[in-house]
Design a protein with these regions (language model features):
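Conserved catalytic motifs of ABC-family nucleotide-binding domains
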Residues: 317
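Edge beta-strands of extracellular beta-sandwich domains
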Residues: 360-362
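N-terminal secretory signal peptides that target proteins for export/translocation
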Residues: 1-5
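N-terminal signal peptide c-region/cleavage motif recognized by signal peptidases
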Residues: 21-23
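Bacterial N-terminal signal peptides
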Residues: 10-19
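ABC transporter nucleotide-binding domain catalytic core, centered on the Walker B motif
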Residues: 324
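Serine-dependent protease modules
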Residues: 26-296, 301-306, 310-312, 331-345, ...
């Protein structure tokens, strides 16, 4: 058997020759700019960071001075005195989307705030007024008093994001000051519990997952792409310690855009389109029962008589697979796709029935008062 080590000798000689020739080849071209020498996010940060703000919210709450005030035993037998006003402070981040002072942040950052102060990256500060807030989406829009010609971020098309894309998270974690962290898009179409304090436990959101470090104080801050555009609003993390474990979630920019558009139009509440249907994901067992080649999509279990899906010809047992070309594999995804289109929009919905496939246009109408987008009727 021929020894393998002998074949290394001519290879080493060839490598030595290449090494001697390399400097001469390298001198033939001078790098055009610093980006060709070393990877740096500095140009992205310079473009995006001025539009990311710190938000200081103050609430006046009623509290009793006694340490036993919240104990039901003591409060039953003893007079623990009157309540006194106490100040609660909250810290978060926000993103300027319009030069005249339109800022988007999380609902839980400004919920029940009596006073809001917004500080820009250049240390200018403004009083803020909430013009639209939604507990379920955990979004709020603030107007800065007397603001003009402010730096603003453009919205990215969050549907164009891909797992593995580089992203930056910008915010004010723990109040230490504006901080930038980097990571990638770890997952898309991630469903999980959504909403600010008091939101229904059953409320499911649709998020972009990232491993960029996100900590308390980053809430409402920016997740930006390498073009310096807003890809999402950082909203929550999964953590046992309260600090970053590399699992953060952002509300996609396409949903943020629909929300801000309604705020700028003067809406007093965020209006969602109403599907008037009850659906469930199609898993492997259900796919076999329905005669489908693979799991995926959502099956319609029931329709309201006035549902826009019923008007478009859908029936119980139909399987919705795509909305505007995007896969729909659960109620949260369907909810998201319809919400992004908004009331008055038209959804192109692909579906299966008895082995046949078709596409139908569904004209979306506003949800009845008190109705969730994927409920059969108001309050159901």
């Amino acid at each position: 058997m021929r020894p393998l080590r002998l074949t290394a000798l001519p290879l080493l000689a060839a490598l030595a020759a290449l090494a001697l020739a390399a400097p001469a080849a390298a001198e033939t071209r001078v790098p055009a700019d610093g980006a060709e020498i070393a990877l740096s996010f500095a140009p992205v940060v310079r473009a995006a960071a001025p539009a990311v703000v710190s938000i200081y919210a103050r609430r006046i709450v009623a509290a009793r001075p006694s340490p036993f005030a919240d104990d039901p035993f003591f409060s039953r037998f003893f007079d623990l005195g009157p309540t006194v006003p106490r100040v609660q402070n909250a810290l978060g981040s926000g993103v300027i989307l319009r030069g005249d002072g339109i800022v988007v942040t999380n609902f839980h950052v400004v919920a029940d705030a009596d006073d809001i102060r917004v500080v820009l990256a250049d240390a200018r500060d403004f009083d803020g007024e909430v013009i639209l807030a939604d507990r379920d989406l955990d979004l709020a829009v603030i107007r800065l008093q007397g603001a003009r010609d402010l730096p603003a971020l453009a919205l990215a098309d969050s549907d164009g994001a891909a797992v593995g894309d580089l992203v930056l998270a910008i915010g004010n974690p723990f109040g230490v000051g504006q901080t930038v962290t980097s990571g990638i898009v770890s997952a898309l179409a991630r469903a999980g519990r959504a909403g600010g304090p008091g939101a229904p436990e059953s409320r499911q959101g649709y998020f972009i997952q990232t491993d960029a470090a996100v900590n308390p104080g980053n809430s409402g801050g920016a997740l930006v792409d390498l073009s310096g555009r807003l890809l999402g609003i950082n909203t929550m993390i999964v953590s046992r310690s309260g600090g970053s474990n590399g699992i953060g979630f952002a509300i996609p920019a396409n949903l943020v855009g629909q929300y801000v558009a309604q705020a700028e139009a003067g809406a007093s509440r965020f209006v969602r389109p109403w599907a008037g249907i009850d659906v469930q994901p199609v898993d492997m067992d259900l796919a076999e029962a329905l005669g489908l080649p693979a799991p995926g999509g959502v099956v319609i279990r029931a329709l309201h008589a006035e549902s826009p899906f019923a008007a478009a010809g859908f029936r119980t047992g139909d399987v919705i697979t795509l909305v505007d070309g995007h896969a729909v594999n659960g109620p949260a995804e369907l909810d998201y796709r319809l919400t992004v289109l908004g009331p008055g929009g038209t959804a192109r919905v692909a579906w299966r029935r008895n082995g046949a496939e078709a596409v139908a246009s569904v004209a979306l109408s506003p949800a009845p008062p008190g109705a969730e987008p994927l409920t059969l009727g108001a309050g159901s």
